[in-house]
Amino acid sequence: MFIKSKRYLYVSLFVFGLIISLYSLVMLGSNTYFFGDLKDPMTIRLFAEHFLLFISFCLILNFVKKNNIKLYLIVFLSMLYLSLHQVLIALMLNIVYVVALIMLGELLLIKLRAEYIEESYVCRLLNNFVIGSLSYIISICLLSAFKLASIRVVKLYSFGLVISVILIYVWLRMLKITPLRSLRPDNCIYSLDFKKDKYMSVVVALTLSVLLLQLGRLNIAIDYDSVRYGFRSLFVLLGDFGIYDTLGTVNDVYVYPKGLEILTLALNTRGSFSFILSFSYVCALLTLLAVYEMVIVSRLKKVEGKVLIDNKRALVALFFAAITPAIINMAISAKTDIITLLMQLISILNMCLYIRVRKLYYIVFSLVSLLSSLIYKPTAPLFSFAVGCAAVIYLCLEFCLKKYYKKENVKKENIENKKSKKSFKLIALMFYPLTAIVLVFARTYILTGHIITSVYSSIWYKLGIGTHFPYTVDEYNSAGVNLAGDVKVDMAYRLYQLFIAPTKEEHIYIASPTVLLLVLIVLGIIYAIIYRYENKDRERSLYKYLMILFIAVTTASALGLYMIHQIDGNYFILFFCLVIINVCLLIESDDVKGLLTATTPCIFFAITVLSVTNWAGVKGLTPAPIAGREFGFYNHHDRKLDTLEGNDFREVYYDLTKLGDPRTLLMSDDNTLLHLCLDIRVYADVVGSGGNVAIVKTLDNFKRYLKFAGIEYICTEENYLAEHDRAKNIIEFMLEDGSLEEYKSYKDVRIYRVKAEQF
């Protein structure tokens, strides 16, 4: 053994973690607003409230004897907290919606499940969610193809679908047609015993507190990207007839694969964003569940005729994932990262189950989930390709090794071959992801001429495949998304920013893995070496697969870190999850306490960073409801109007509303009108990254765009025009030639009416 005593290892890691945490803290304090955020009264209140929650959970877990009473008390306390912060109704509605999608998947797979059923109940639920989500997305796309998908139809259809699915599922359960349980045996014993492992009650209490913290600030964590496109699907995704309508958007972000936005169309309201954010949060819970189950599945073993389920290590893995800001901060954003991560983890979970039991249908489910990830995020192909490559490499190695070493009788081979041939009907499952990919990417193709944009646009242009107006104007193409380009990249400095100190770049700071992941990487390398040399006689197929997977994802992450201009931590959340999973798989159950002790400084540092960071940059928790105005959910629309007293954009909002919410081009950096859910197109989208500056190169091009987009009014802000000469010149030229007239003037803001008849 390389290290005589594990105690020395954990003491060394504790000291290393403490030093690196203090260093990172000092660097954050000197380069960011970290210390100022910590001193803010709202942050202090957050810490006080959650310290009380943490103590309450610890007392319940340690002093209440009956498990059912523990559960009731925790649920009651959580519901009280959620009601205070106005997220209970939105969360419950989303839980019902996600459960309905899971039930829909179960109903669609009912015939298949008569022959094939997952050994893991959690995996079965997650596979159901994948199939149910794909089916819903396909149905909305088909309604759009037949020009039937107005917002009213989508909401009525979704409501009817949820009610019908729940009623049919309950009816089939009463008739005992659907399987009532998984194949997980009844004779299970669990490694976690709160009486013996009292320190685990602290882990559970911290996990619950952190998860509630995210819900407590969910309503106020309204980030720029979510407002820009996540919450505005009713105006930038769904037209009068469906998702394939031309809505006058000019930026790559509006033509990305919109799987998540389609999935949440029915949850989209003008009054509150809580419903969409709660869906992301539920997806984050499913992601944590996938991490938990992956450790469970990978460490299953029989002891004296009983199945040992190592839920202690699984719970630690869930805990580490829940306190990593880069991962869990995605739970309160309308960004697509968390659902993409969920699909990738479901794929990996199915592969782990295949390696455990050697049943072909797990490979099919794994491929279904992996392909599903492509419809949610444009950068998913990079990391999903790495996951797919790892699976292919492992299967090829397995096939070659079996062919070389296997000397079993022919009968057994024949039986296995028959089972494999019988399993080929599972390939029909590929209909769901492939159809969804075609229908979702069809929107991008119809609107742009490319099947996928973002970082891939330059490839199509080099192949001679052009885009439609306004993504191509004359000979000028859309700018696409910035890569690092020819700029020399200092990888060591980027790694330093990502894992130790983000310096002054706030976008890294709010999605930081913190030094916790750095310590876990060091520990993972040590344990991988120990496991490799101490377990020569054990079954190590799963270990081999996870190592291949880890190398593949690490390579993809390094490539992304090198190529991508902006190194947000959320790009690498799959890598972070795999680090956590691998560490928790490689340690022994008896070493869990040592692991938690060694990482204590990093754990508290990660929780501290998490408490003051989110994509919106807000501090504190959602305020209490306004009596007589808010009934169970947060009214973002009215709350925003309340903050605009004396602001010109408040009057602009009322005037545009009186006009019937005409499509308006906004020349301002203020996103108030976007927040208030008006039909707005933004000038910065046209000329910025992902847009096409050629639209404003000539006045004729700009007029052509206004006509194409159906722009009826232009709203300008004086300060913005003073900083953007071209925007100012365009307004002046159009006023001179009579194609624009002033409709209303305020202190710093003006509304102009576009006279399209003059074009």
Where do the protein language model's features map onto the residues?
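Membrane-embedded, hydrophobic transmembrane alpha-helices
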Residues: 1-188, 702-703
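Hydrophobic, aromatic-rich transmembrane alpha-helices
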Residues: 52-63, 284-295, 493-544
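Signature aromatic-anchored transmembrane alpha helix within multi-pass, membrane-resident enzymes
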Residues: 198-204, 308-315, 361-369, 384-388, ...
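Active-site lumenal/periplasmic loops and adjacent helix-entry segments of GT-C-fold
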Residues: 208-299, 304-309, 313, 317, ...
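Membrane-proximal, lumen/periplasm-facing interface regions of secretory-pathway glyco-
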Residues: 221-225, 230-232, 608-654
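Hydrophobic/aromatic-rich transmembrane helices and adjacent perimembrane loops
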Residues: 235, 337-343, 373-376, 381-383, ...
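Membrane-lumen/periplasm interface segments of specific transmembrane helices
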Residues: 397, 425-505
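Short periplasmic/luminal acceptor-recognition loop of GT-C membrane glycosyltransferases, typified by
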Residues: 641-686, 712-719
